[in-house]
């Protein structure tokens, strides 16, 4: 639904806010306006950070400098003539991630929240070093070029056309970044079990994708991880077989050509495709190399893995001379795979678990063990911990969601299995992994995150308040309270060390670190008051392990017939040996049942296991406040330096009678508090210069945007001949977030505008000029969701209700009222098919009336209203399909 101006009458368009629904992220700030940003720098980097995080900033700056030297040697290149790389430290999201871009300047963002131990990046000892190695590789490769592109960048700045490497397929770019992170970090993804297990299981099942199936974005397991998994394994395979010097040579080939075409036979373009570029380096096409890669994995996975190869003492409850098969020891109860986490038994012979399916919205599911039927209990994303209270028949879980429209923090929720209702217990508390105290129904043990430290905490259900009871550590996850309430087991990570299992007293004192010096250990579960189970990273595998606190004996359930375990739960009862676990297989994580007494295990004595039996003194792993390092004095962030334009690019606008070439530039500071975009054009027929300027300020609660435009079109009328139509507009716009969470979003919109519209006829004397000054108000709601394999929105709704009024007392020539309503709904059929419904209603009244049109109008900048994604649904009908002062539209696609 858009409005349309007519050359035959003094009527101008009314904005119907479609862009707000297409680009809802533009209506709220990314970082809270109250954050005071500081910076430190050296010759190569500028680290920008919130006040109070200087120690992290100093460590980041030093680590980045070390990695830069190492990575430029690895890739055999130097970043010529580039300004300093900006690194922004973000502690506003309880998620582990990073990003990098060269546009409009080289910048990296690091989420300071460390990954949990079950993450594919959770095996590293140093999260900041790992993410910096990955993102710096992107920056170095993005900036690779040739003499021609380096010269052109001096003139046009960071114009994307002058950065050929960004056009390399994403799976190759991400594969190179994972390869580099693994070359510079012990915990890189190629050095830890997760990727190896996924690849081996997929290869063993004969599900490695063919070249044609892999190209692009595959929808089979592991979904969005595929470009990292296969890309990294492929690049690593090439480095091992053909030499690690071939990988940087490949980047140079991609960077040499300024555009992805070469010109042969005159000016006829011939694409230098991916196959040809690989062939120049490896003398084989990508398809041939991929077949070699597949054959390598088929050969490697022919034999079944044997994880127990160290000659330890083995015990099997059945017949050790005739070990059971996998099918005899594990009863799979799901088969579709994907991500299944935190399975727990409930008292009604059912299992509750979290299903994170990249094809649909995640949530908590329930599985009936007898019938094997599943049903979704609730929709919820960002779940990071789950606990079942058998006394209450309730699920307590933690999940990250938006808080105050800006932060994405983890909070505690309660799901009543009797009523299937969810209650949010905290807001913005940064609490994780809730576990009920067996002796106090109002007490919940959990982990609390404060700045860059993790603490054991107690949440009181009566007062809805939490209290820190332990020292701070680099990270803490997955806690469990012993049945006798004398110990709290936790997955613990100290600074630059591996994940371990530690015991705390109920008052938060660290009593013992059980697995110091072992591989990664996490996810403790109590069998009884003295036997503690957990997951152990052992021989490139994840297996069950246990510690008997009475004897200090360390058991490893390294049965070669058991797949790698990701999460598990024990059925309540001293004599009950049932266990449900989430296993790695070729489809992802599937749930299976096991009996502990049937599992083969081996015993290691305390000394052999490296157990730390002595009582540890309480200590803080969180960096203490210290004086800034010499030469690293912090100062306020210089946003003006980054706001200055860093590029110019060609642009155009047109109508049916005139094409106007022009230029565009834009800029933003690192915190996105200030941003602008400037476009200018010149028309040879109208002999006019157009300007379109927008500045946005995100330093207050409402996002404020100032817009000025002076645009001219050369038109023709059958009655009056050629004429020049001019629209001059000043707008002050405000966006007010009402409801922001991961499931849906709602905003208020306000607009004050002063607008002048005129037509100057070339064959007649005089001109028509009209003033339209007033306000616009709107409210918008959007719950439409895209998923990994979506080519359009797949479910949810979006709606908008808007009203506009022009006032004479503001200088308008007429009092005009206009209103519009738009509703869209998306219904998933058999995927990826979607049924979309669209209803639009509009009307205008007063001393004059607005003119609306309904249809997929093409804008004067060459893009359709629905955006440049041709697969977006609800494109509507062709331009000008229906025109009028009011009406409705309904269609189904």
Across the structure, where does each feature detected by a protein language model lie?
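Feature captures outer-membrane beta-barrel proteins of Gram-negative bacteria and organelles
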Residues: 414, 546, 662-669, 689-708, ...
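Outer-membrane beta-barrel initiation region
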Residues: 333, 342, 589-590, 595-705, ...
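Beta/coil-rich, acidic/histidine-enriched accessory regions frequently appended to metallopeptidases
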Residues: 28-31, 36-39, 222-225, 250-252, ...
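Juxtacatalytic substrate-recognition/specificity segment
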Residues: 28-163, 169
């Amino acid at each position: 639904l858009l409005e349309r101006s007519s050359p035959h009458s003094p009527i101008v368009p009314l904005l119907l806010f479609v862009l707000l629904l297409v680009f809802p992220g533009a209506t709220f700030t990314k970082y809270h306006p109250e954050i005071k940003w500081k910076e430190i720098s050296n010759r190569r980097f500028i680290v920008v950070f919130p006040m109070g995080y200087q120690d992290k900033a100093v460590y980041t700056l030093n680590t980045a400098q070390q990695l830069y030297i190492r990575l430029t040697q690895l890739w055999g290149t130097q970043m010529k003539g580039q300004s300093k790389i900006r690194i922004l430290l973000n502690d506003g999201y309880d998620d582990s991630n990073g990003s990098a871009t060269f546009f409009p300047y080289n910048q990296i963002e690091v989420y300071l929240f460390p990954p949990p131990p079950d993450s594919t990046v959770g095996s590293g000892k140093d999260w900041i070093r790992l993410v910096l190695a990955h993102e710096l590789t992107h920056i170095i490769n993005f900036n690779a070029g040739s003499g021609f592109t380096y010269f052109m960048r001096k003139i046009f700045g960071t114009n994307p056309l002058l950065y050929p490497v960004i056009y390399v397929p994403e799976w190759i770019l991400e594969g190179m970044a994972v390869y580099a992170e693994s070359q510079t970090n012990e915990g890189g993804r190629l050095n830890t079990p997760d990727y190896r297990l996924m690849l081996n299981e997929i290869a063993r099942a004969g599900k490695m994708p063919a070249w044609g199936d892999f190209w692009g974005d595959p929808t089979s397991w592991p979904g969005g991880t595929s470009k990292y998994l296969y890309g990294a394994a492929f690049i690593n395979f090439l480095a091992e077989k053909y030499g690690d010097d071939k990988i940087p040579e490949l980047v140079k080939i991609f960077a040499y050509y300024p555009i992805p075409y070469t010109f042969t036979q005159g000016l006829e373009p011939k694409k230098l495709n991916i196959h040809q570029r690989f062939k120049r380096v490896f003398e084989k096409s990508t398809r041939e190399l991929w077949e070699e890669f597949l054959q390598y994995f088929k050969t490697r996975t022919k034999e079944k893995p044997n994880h127990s190869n160290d000659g330890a003492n083995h015990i099997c409850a059945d017949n050790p001379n005739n070990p059971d098969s996998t099918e005899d020891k594990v009863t799979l109860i799901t088969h579709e795979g994907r991500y299944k986490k935190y399975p727990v038994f409930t008292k009604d012979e059912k299992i509750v678990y979290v299903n994170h399916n990249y094809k649909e919205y995640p949530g908590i599911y329930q599985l009936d063990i007898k019938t094997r039927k599943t049903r979704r209990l609730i929709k919820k994303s960002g779940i990071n911990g789950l606990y079942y209270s058998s006394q209450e028949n309730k699920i307590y879980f933690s999940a990250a969601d938006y808080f105050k429209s800006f932060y994405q923090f983890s909070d505690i929720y309660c799901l009543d299995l009797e009523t299937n209702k969810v209650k949010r217990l905290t807001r913005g508390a940064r609490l994780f992994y809730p576990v009920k105290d067996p002796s106090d129904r109002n007490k919940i043990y959990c982990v609390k995150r404060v700045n860059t430290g993790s603490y054991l905490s107690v949440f009181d259900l009566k007062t809805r308040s939490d209290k820190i009871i332990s020292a701070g550590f680099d990270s803490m996850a997955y806690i469990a309270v012993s049945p006798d309430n004398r110990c709290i087991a936790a997955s613990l990570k100290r600074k630059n060390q591996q994940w371990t299992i530690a015991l705390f007293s109920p008052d938060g004192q660290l009593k013992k670190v059980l697995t110091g010096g072992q591989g990664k250990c996490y996810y403790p579960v109590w069998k009884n008051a003295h036997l503690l189970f957990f997951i152990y990273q052992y021989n490139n595998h994840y297996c069950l392990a246990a510690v008997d606190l009475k004897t200090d004996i360390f058991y490893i359930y390294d049965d070669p017939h058991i797949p790698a375990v990701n999460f598990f739960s024990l059925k309540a009862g001293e004599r009950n040996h049932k266990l449900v676990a989430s296993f790695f297989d070729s489809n992802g994580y599937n749930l299976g049942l096991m009996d502990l007494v049937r599992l083969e295990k081996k015993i290691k004595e305390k000394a052999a296991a490296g157990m730390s039996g002595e009582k540890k003194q309480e200590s803080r792993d969180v960096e203490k406040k210290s004086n800034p390092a010499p030469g690293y004095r912090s100062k306020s962030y210089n946003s003006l330096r980054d706001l200055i334009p860093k590029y110019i690019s060609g642009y155009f606008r047109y109508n049916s009678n005139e094409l106007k070439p022009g230029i565009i530039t834009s800029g933003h500071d690192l915190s996105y508090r200030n941003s602008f975009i400037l476009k200018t054009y010149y028309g040879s027929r109208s002999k006019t210069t157009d300007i379109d300027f927008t500045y946005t300020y995100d330093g207050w609660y409402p996002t404020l945007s100032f817009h000025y435009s002076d645009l001219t079109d050369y038109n023709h009328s059958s009655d009056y001949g050629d004429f020049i139509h001019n629209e001059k507009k000043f707008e002050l716009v405000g966006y007010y977030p009402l409801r922001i969470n991961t499931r849906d979003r709602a905003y208020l919109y306000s607009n004050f505008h002063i607008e002048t519209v005129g037509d100057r006829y070339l064959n007649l004397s005089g001109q028509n000029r009209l003033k339209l000054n007033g306000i616009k108000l709107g409210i918008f709601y959007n719950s439409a969701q895209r998923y990994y394999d979506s080519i359009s929105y797949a479910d949810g709704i979006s709606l908008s209700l808007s009203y506009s009024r022009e006032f004479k007392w503001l200088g308008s020539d007429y009092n005009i009222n206009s209103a519009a309503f738009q509703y869209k709904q998306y219904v998933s059929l058999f995927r990826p098919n979607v049924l979309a419904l669209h209803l639009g209603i509009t009307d205008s009244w007063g001393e004059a009336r607005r003119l609306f049109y309904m249809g997929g109008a093409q804008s004067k900048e060459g893009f359709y209203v629905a955006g440049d994604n041709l697969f977006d649904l609800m494109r509507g009908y062709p331009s000008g399909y229906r025109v009028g002062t009011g009406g409705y539209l309904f269609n189904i696609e």
